[in-house]
Amino acid sequence: MQFDSVPVTRAEQNCSILWCPVTHAAAVIDPGGDLDRIECFLEWEQLRLELVLVTHAHPDHAGGAARLATATGARLEGPHRGDEHLVRSLAEQGRRYRLPADDFTPDRWLQDGDEVRFGREALKVLHCPGHSQGHVAYFHPGRRHAFVGDILFRHAIGAWEHADGNLGELVRSIREKLFTLGDDVSFTPGHGETSTFGHERLHNPFIGDEALARWRADRLL
């Protein structure tokens, strides 16, 4: 599998474009907007879009998913059904944040452990609630790379201080679903630079091993 990222929307959200080098079939993760950039990349690389994937239903990540799938005939899959109320209110969210967005019904709601396929490639689905109830991440075992949306960032973690967020679930998603994939696994976050899970375990001031040990010690004092 090959992949690259295109920044979209004023939030500079990392829209990831993945493709099978044998069949040139492609998948796009989180087309939040600026579809012309995404379509130009696909055309430049001579790729055929088969699959549109969504990590969670916030407008900077999912706002353009329906339009891209309709324009290309690609399947639209994800997120987990826990985000159904957000999927149904994307247009309203978009108006609130001044980001163009359309509601949609996915061709498939995703569950933990599912596989999504394009060309000869497959990604494993990990249900990772915490930033939203239906948030999912995608993992390619062969490339040892994950696409984690807004759960984890380089030296930071996703926001949880809103109606659909939950800090405990966020911590469990990162520590039990992502970090257990292995220290060598690299990841593309929803915003900012790539990193590895091993680096974040050592250096992330919010969720790293030392940070978690301090937090647990403070609770015992």
Question: Where in this protein do the model-derived segments appear?
Answer:
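Conserved beta-strand hairpin/beta-sheet module of binuclear metal-dependent hydrolase folds
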Residues: 1-45, 137-149
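Short Gly/Pro-enriched turn/cap motifs at secondary-structure boundaries
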Residues: 6-8, 99-100, 105-107, 127-129
